[in-house]
Amino acid sequence: MLIKVKSAVSWMRARLSAISLADIQKHLAKIIILAPMAVLLIYLAIFSQPRYMSESKVAIKRSDDLNSGSLNFGLLLGASNPSSAEDALYLKEYINSPDMLAALDKQLNFREAFSHSGLDFLNHLSKDETAEGFLKYYKDRINVSYDDKTGLLNIQTQGFSPEFALKFNQTVLKESERFINEMSHRIARDQLAFAETEMEKARQRLDASKAELLSYQDNNNVLDPQAQAQAASTLVNTLMGQKIQMEADLRNLLTYLREDAPQVVSARNAIQSLQAQIDEEKSKITAPQGDKLNRMAVDFEEIKSKVEFNTELYKLTLTSIEKTRVEAARKLKVLSVISSPQLPQESSFPNIPYLIACWLLVCCLLFGTLKLLLAVIEDHRD
């Protein structure tokens, strides 16, 4: 057995030594250039399936930009809106996402459409392809690029038929519009929901302070302690003025009447009665007990201040809601189609002249490299 193996090795060495570098160089062009070019031409002639491309250009605008009649010098100078640029990049990521692929597969039966590739094994999509492979194949069939100078998003879609390439692009635009609308409306809804929540809190606080005010009025049987205290103070001042006048009249009587004169006694009694009334009215205004007008006025003022503060706060929240609605409507974003997708008339892929030129260039470079390498080896052997 060992003898047979040694014999086979010796035979192979003899055959290899019989092949000279000159023989390799003689057939190198056929191996490196002609054979690969023949394979490429056979693939292009027999196996390759033509693919058509539909193209559209879109921009993302805010509603106030569309309604504004003012001249935007930034756009004239080629500067894009930073907010629109950010939204365009968001949309680009969404178009290349599995979510967009799922929507397209549901509407266009994407997997089924690209599984019918004929003999084109290089561009065939297996019906049993994994989710990762399916997504990679999808990204190879769509190209989304953003131009930061014009702010436009260029969308190119491919299909094995002109009709599918067009339908592919139209569906991408429809889903993109839905995504932009949902994104902008969701932000507006969140802002409005927050404003409405704050308004509801302010309304509850206002209702609570009003209920506290009504309860205080009912429990103390008083409408406005401040007004009543003011009226009582005015009455006391009036009575004190009357008392001063009566005391002056009494002193005048004493100038010509005795102390026990009926007129003097009557005047003194009247002054005492008036003083008693003054003391009674003063006791209603100020006293250590908690049911007096001065303490009631302080408590009432505090409750009334709460009502006024909560009323102003509620008004502010109502104004905030209206401003939020206007601002949300102003900032709503729309997908503006600048160039609509068209039905392609000619296939775009494969680009046969380009492929042949590139393939020939690569083969020639490889041929030259190997030619040089063999020449170096030949020199060393010599």
From Swiss-Prot:
Q: Which InterPro entries match?
A: Bact_polysacc_biosynth/exp (IPR050445), BexC_CtrB_KpsE_VexD (IPR005705)
Where does the record locate the signal sequence feature?
Answer: none
Compartment(s) of residence: Cell inner membrane
Q: Which keywords has UniProt assigned to this entry?
A: Capsule biogenesis/degradation, Cell inner membrane, Cell membrane, Membrane, Polysaccharide transport, Sugar transport, Transmembrane, Transmembrane helix, Transport
Q: Which domain of life is it from?
A: Bacteria
- Which membrane topology describes this protein? Multi-pass membrane protein
* Similarity annotation: Belongs to the BexC/CtrB/KpsE family.
The name under which this protein is listed is Capsule polysaccharide export inner-membrane protein KpsE
